[in-house]
UniProtKB/Swiss-Prot annotation:
The active site is at residues 8, 10. Transmembrane segments: none annotated. The keyword Hydrolase applies. InterPro entries: HAD-like_sf, HAD-SF_hydro_IIIA, HAD_sf, His_synth_bifunc_HisB, HisB_N, Histidinol-phos, IGPD_sf, ImidazoleglycerolP_deHydtase. Residues 169-375 are annotated as: Imidazoleglycerol-phosphate dehydratase. In the N-terminal section; belongs to the histidinol-phosphatase family. Keywords: Amino-acid biosynthesis, Cytoplasm, Histidine biosynthesis, Hydrolase, Lyase, Magnesium, Metal-binding, Multifunctional enzyme. Its cofactor is Mg(2+). It comes from Xanthomonas axonopodis pv. citri (strain 306). GO terms for molecular function: histidinol-phosphatase activity; imidazoleglycerol-phosphate dehydratase activity; metal ion binding. This is Histidine biosynthesis bifunctional protein HisB. GO terms for cellular component: cytoplasm. Coiled coil: none annotated. It comes from the Bacteria.
């Protein structure tokens, strides 16, 4: 899915003159900070589409030839800096015409509304007038009004680029069924003490390990049919957590993607490769988790538990919980544990997963970590 940044032209990309017509080369001047901001957004995966009202373009008062020269030069300047526009959409009507193709109308947007490859949740509109914001509202996307002396507004280009490209990776998932009501809220870019309440104290303690050792803010609230047994509550919590991870990561641009032993791990065999996953000891127990946010859910578990349950958590539901996370998040997880104490073994599994997640979700740049073009 590709996000689109729709941009106005006059007053947004280039400074608008007093007569509102850029019909001569000497009138052409770029808006401050527009190029570095758009380069940042390009690197974050955005494509750009110009949507502009040009009153009476092609009439005697505004000949097409007077428009084309400065406009082509503007496009060449942007292209020379690595900024290409997917399309330039111009409405040439007068305001009195009330044409559906004139902003804030969205008549020019029909092909885009039919394009299922567009990430509308991340798409946005930037302009200097209230009609640009109304255009964004009609498209049901976010609108940014650039700050100008004439039309007001609150944003500059640097702030817009930061808001869109560096947006916090958050998710709020509410999963309601006849058996459970699960609420998961997380913020992958904020550290906070985890908060969990599922009605199963030992399970709460394990969920806290994911947020604490994963290095992100995590809140989980669950109400389930515990009068029947624990299965639905634990399973649906895993599904909701997996969905929240998937939503917060978005297109996964810039993340580490993989979680495994770092080169500096004291638990790796000398000269070994990180194929055994993130290895974590807990007294006599050792667990390892290797994971990949590939978009292809797959779960492999190697380990045994001697006890039927630890606290109020059935041990048979430990691997089932991790499988549920994988199914909902598109995660490939290999989890291995060995030891004597089942409490230690369960807790080590959760901590190993958390530390592997910490690596995989870490931002390392802006590139998409795949050669396929999508994850």
């Amino acid at each position: 899915m590709t996000p689109i940044l729709f941009v106005d032209r006059d007053g947004t990309l280039i400074v608008e003159p007093a007569d509102y017509q850029i019909d001569a080369y000497e009138k052409l001047r770029l808006v401050d900070h527009v190029i570095p901001a758009m380069l940042k957004l390009r690197d974050a995966g955005y494509q750009f589409v110009i949507v502009s009202n040009q009153d009476g373009l092609g009439s005697e008062s505004y000949p097409r030839a007077s428009f084309d020269g400065p406009n082509n030069l503007m496009l060449q300047i942007f292209a020379s800096q690595g900024i290409e526009f997917r399309e330039v959409l111009i409405d040439c009507s007068w305001p009195a015409d009330n044409a559906p193709t004139r902003k804030p109308g969205i008549g020019l947007m029909v092909p885009y509304l039919q394009d299922r490859t567009i990430d509308w949740a991340r798409s946005a509109m930037v302009g200097d007038r209230i009609t640009d914001i109304q255009f964004a509202q009609n498209l049901n996307i976010r609108g940014f009004q650039l700050r100008t002396d004439e039309f007001g507004g609150e944003w500059d280009w640097s702030g817009i680029a930061h808001e869109l490209a560096d947006a916090p990776r958050r998710a709020l998932v509410q999963r309601n069924t006849k058996e459970t009501r699960i609420r998961v809220e997380l913020d992958l870019d904020r550290v906070a003490e985890p908060k969990t309440a599922t009605g199963l104290p030992f399970f709460d303690h394990m969920l806290e390990q994911i947020g604490k050792h994963g290095g992100f803010a995590l809140e989980i609230r669950a109400e389930g049919d515990l009068h029947i047994d624990e299965h639905h509550t634990i399973e649906d919590t895993g599904l909701a957590l997996g969905q929240a991870l998937r939503e917060a990561l978005g297109d996964k641009r810039g993340i580490g993607r993989y979680g495994f032993d770092p080169e500096s791990s004291p638990w790796r065999v000398a000269g070994d490769t990180p194929q055994h996953g993130f290895t974590l000891p807990m007294d006599e127990t050792i667990a390892s988790a290797a994971l990949d946010f590939s978009g292809r859910p797959y779960f492999v578990f190697e380990g045994e538990f001697k006890r039927e349950r630890v606290g109020d958590m059935p041990t048979e539901l430990v691997p089932h919980f991790f499988r549920s996370i994988c199914d909902a998040s598109g995660l490939n997880l290999h989890l291995t544990v060995r030891g004597e104490n089942d409490h230690h073994k369960v807790e080590a599994c959760f901590k190993a997963l958390a530390r592997a997640l910490r690596q995989a979700i870490r931002r390392e740049g802006t590139a998409l970590p795949t050669t396929k073009g999508t994850l």
